């Protein structure tokens, strides 16, 4: 056995570094510190400049490296090394990924980095290694950094204390909403879509003119997101209003497409723009899989003919299919329609995380711009005061030029002599001594007084501005107008007119009311089939009718569970013991040549959940649902249709599970419990509900509900014994009682399994 490894003996001070505390408290404190670090230093953007620390550090490092738009690009590896060595104590991969994202036109609405080389593409291909690519800042990045060297923002020590970095950038435009952001922290996440910067600035101007403007007013200026990849936003205005009011919601977007005639009555669909953050290669693969799996019944072929622009060609299976119907079916099945989640979770000026609506975010940005304005003004004021002080000294020197020149030439300590003779300060004396004699002799009183007067006028203007909040807000608006004009010069091939009058990428539209399902069903040949579902959950569909079920073959240890006659155009409903309904298209079921396929591969059904009933959907029919706890209700069959693989929760079963799902065929309902007691009551006493728990059907001291039977009072009740023989029940009225009663014991000769029909 290996000997345990012990720590080396420590010195006399080691006891000071050993903490004796409960493990839970130590873990809790450290995890909290980690969570706060992740939230504040990595995952969430600042509401003022819209940047996470890594993006801010990349831009600041590039600014220090003088990688301005008019400069030559430098290797990205050089930038990453600068960021990692001086500001960001993390891996180079995360820094390079952040830099690459800032340069991608399909990721950023306004790219902040100009990349040269392979920076990835909309297909999802990665960027080239950092040693091969080069970068520099864009004009938009310069707008974010404008004033960084004029004390516009606070600085803090870097991680090693060797340098300083900005806490936030001056941010000339509302970058948070302009470029959006996404990130996952501990216990919270953020997801912000990009917007049109010109529209955002117009909204800011509206808030400057009317701080009481509502979110609805702001939506007149910012009607919705503006995604870099274009596309069509089909989210309703009411939904967008709620999203921007609360800061939470989502935006539904679709691919932009057009119809191209190919002659002889045929056509093809060409997709020119796809939803934001959808990888084109994955989309093509998804559409191809839909064709192979026969889920896209109207689509015949898909081709990617993209070059610099996106061009996905979709060929319909039949020329008789309407283009709108084809696209609606694909929107339902593929990423041609996507939903971008919105969660404007950001750090405020104090570093506190919180969810903001669009008005709160813009107001925080405007407050930041005002602070930047006043800080730059005070910085300029200090510069002016210093220059005026020097000009006063130079004016004294000019008025006494001969004496000043004599002192400078012949005195051993000219500085002390100047101060003593003319009453100058150290700064004024140094300024005179630092001026060459030739320049000192060329000083002109008019020039000094002119510069002095200009600076005094500028100083008075700054002081007046600092004393007036109204003037400050006015200058903020003027600055935003200048930034707006600069941003509008940035053009892109996808730019189109927007509702606000400016150009943008995304447009707005409405999803047409097209019944794609009906069109798909119309193309399915209507044929009779028999659905076979085994006890272990293997499903298949046989053509025609099965006369002798005993001839069916199953896997070893398996046997018949359900035998359901249907048609290929039917929707198959599956009811599970956890109260959920699942829907499968009968035309998509595997053939009966083999044993079929596990139904759990087609629907999300847990292994512990049992299938209670299987039947084809029929419009206008009603079902009786009941749980083993003895509760139930009446439900229209339309409420059972589910569009998701996870199904639709309809019956709240609690811990007991579902008991039965009966077709409502008469006016009476008979229920039997595990205790062998039967209760019959009118079906009209059951409420009709789309979902829920229902009302009490029968009372039990022990056990629960076992089975039920719906029948017509005129034809009478019955049961089917274990041999499959029908037994009419003439005395059924003796078991009639009030709903929720206990009932009476079963009649003589009743089925031994205490069920109205064999399970």
Swiss-Prot record:
Q: Which GO terms describe its molecular function?
A: ATP binding; DNA binding; DNA topoisomerase type II (double strand cut, ATP-hydrolyzing) activity
Name the source's superkingdom: Bacteria
Q: Where is this site: Interaction with DNA?
A: 52, 88, 90
Q: Which UniProt keywords apply?
A: Cell membrane, DNA-binding, Isomerase, Membrane, Topoisomerase
Extract the Pfam families matched here.
DNA_gyraseA_C, DNA_topoisoIV
- Chain positions of site Transition state stabilizer: 131
An example of a Gene Ontology BP annotation on this entry?
DNA topological change
Q: Which Gene3D superfamilies match?
A: 3.30.1360.40, DNA gyrase/topoisomerase IV, subunit A, C-terminal, Topoisomerase II, domain 5, Topoisomerase, domain 3
Catalysed conversion reaction: ATP-dependent breakage, passage and rejoining of double-stranded DNA
Q: Which residues form the Topo IIA-type catalytic domain?
A: 44-516
A GO CC annotation given for this chain: extrinsic component of plasma membrane
Check the record and name the PROSITE patterns matching this protein: TOPO_IIA
Q: How does it assemble?
A: Heterotetramer composed of ParC and ParE.
What name goes with this protein?
A: DNA topoisomerase 4 subunit A
User: Source species, please?
Assistant: Caulobacter vibrioides (strain ATCC 19089 / CIP 103742 / CB 15)
């Amino acid at each position: 056995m290996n000997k345990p490894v012990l720590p080396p003996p420590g010195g006399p001070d080691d006891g000071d570094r050993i903490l004796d505390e409960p493990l839970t408290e130590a873990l809790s404190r450290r995890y909290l510190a980690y969570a706060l670090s992740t939230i504040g230093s990595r995952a969430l953007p600042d509401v003022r400049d819209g940047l996470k620390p890594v993006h801010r550090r990349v831009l600041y490092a590039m600014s220090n490296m003088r990688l301005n738009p008019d400069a030559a690009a430098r290797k990205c590896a050089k930038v990453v090394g600068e960021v990692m060595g001086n500001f960001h104590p993390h891996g180079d991969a995360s820094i390079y990924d952040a830099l690459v994202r800032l340069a991608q036109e399909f990721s950023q609405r306004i790219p902040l980095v100009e990349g040269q080389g392979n920076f990835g593409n909309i297909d999802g291909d990665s960027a080239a290694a950092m040693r091969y690519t080069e970068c520099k800042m864009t004009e938009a990045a310069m707008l974010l950094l404008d004033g960084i060297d004029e004390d516009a923002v606070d600085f803090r020590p870097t991680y090693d204390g060797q340098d300083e970095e900005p806490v936030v950038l001056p941010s000339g435009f509302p970058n948070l909403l302009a470029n959006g952001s996404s990130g996952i922290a501990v216990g919270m996440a953020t997801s912000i879509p990009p917007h049109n910067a010109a529209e955002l600035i117009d909204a800011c101007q509206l808030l400057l003119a009317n701080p009481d403007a509502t979110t609805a007013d702001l939506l007149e200026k910012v009607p919705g997101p503006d995604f870099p990849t274009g596309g069509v936003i089909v989210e309703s205005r009411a939904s967008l209003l709620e999203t921007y009011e609360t800061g939470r919601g989502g935006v539904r977007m679709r691919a932009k497409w057009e119809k191209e005639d190919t002659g002889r009555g045929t056509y093809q669909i060409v997709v020119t723009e796809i939803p934001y953050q959808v990888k084109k290669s994955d989309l093509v693969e998804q559409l191809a899989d839909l064709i192979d799996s026969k889920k896209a019944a109207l689509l015949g072929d898909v081709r990617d003919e993209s070059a610099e622009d996106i061009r996905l060609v979709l060929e319909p299976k039949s020329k008789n299919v309407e283009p709108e119907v084809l696209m609606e079916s694909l929107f339902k099945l593929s990423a041609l329609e996507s939903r971008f989640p919105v969660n404007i979770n950001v750090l405020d000026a104090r570093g506190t995380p919180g969810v903001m609506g669009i008005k709160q975010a813009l107001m925080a940005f405007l407050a930041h711009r005002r602070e930047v304005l006043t800080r730059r003004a005070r910085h300029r004021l200090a510069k002016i005061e210093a220059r005026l002080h020097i000009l006063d000294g130079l004016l004294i020197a000019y008025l006494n030029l001969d004496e000043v020149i004599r002192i400078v030439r012949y005195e051993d300590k000219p500085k002390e002599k100047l101060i003593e003779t003319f009453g100058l300060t150290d700064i004024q004396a140094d300024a005179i001594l630092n001026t060459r004699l030739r320049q000192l002799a060329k000083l002109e009183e008019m020039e000094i007084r002119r510069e002095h007067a200009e600076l005094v006028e500028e100083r008075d203007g700054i002081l007046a501005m600092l004393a007036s909040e109204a003037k400050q807000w006015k200058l903020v608006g003027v600055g935003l107008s200048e930034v707006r004009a600069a941003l509008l010069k940035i053009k892109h091939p996808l730019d189109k007119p927007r509702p606000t009058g400016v150009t943008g990428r995304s447009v707005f539209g409405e999803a047409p009311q097209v019944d794609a399902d009906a069109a798909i069903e119309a193309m399915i040949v209507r044929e009779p089939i028999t659905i076979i579902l085994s006890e272990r959950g293997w499903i298949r569909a046989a053509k025609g009718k099965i006369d002798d079920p005993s001839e069916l073959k199953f896997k070893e240890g398996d046997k018949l569970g359900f035998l359901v006659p249907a048609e290929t155009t039917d929707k198959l409903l599956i009811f599970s013991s956890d109260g959920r309904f699942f829907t499968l298209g009968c035309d998509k079921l595997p053939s009966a040549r083999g044993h079929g396929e596990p139904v759990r591969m087609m629907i999300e059904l847990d292994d512990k959940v049992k299938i209670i009933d299987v039947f084809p959907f029929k419009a206008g029919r009603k079902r009786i649902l009941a749980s083993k706890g003895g509760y139930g209700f009446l439900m229209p069959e339309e409420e059972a249709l589910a569009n998701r693989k996870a199904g639709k929760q309809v019956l709240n079963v609690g811990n007991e599970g579902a008991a039965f799902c009966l077709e409502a065929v008469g006016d009476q309902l008979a229920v039997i419990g595990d205790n062998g007691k039967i209760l019959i009551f009118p079906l009209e006493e059951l409420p009709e509900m789309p979902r829920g728990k229902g009302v009490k059907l029968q009372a039990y001291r022990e056990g629960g509900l076992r089975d039920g039977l719906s029948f017509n009072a005129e034809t009478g009740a019955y049961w089917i014994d274990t041999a499959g023989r029908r037994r009419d029940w003439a005395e059924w009225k003796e078991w009639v009682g009030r709903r929720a009663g206990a009932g009476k014991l079963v009649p003589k000769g009743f089925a031994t399994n205490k069920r109205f029909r064999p399970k």
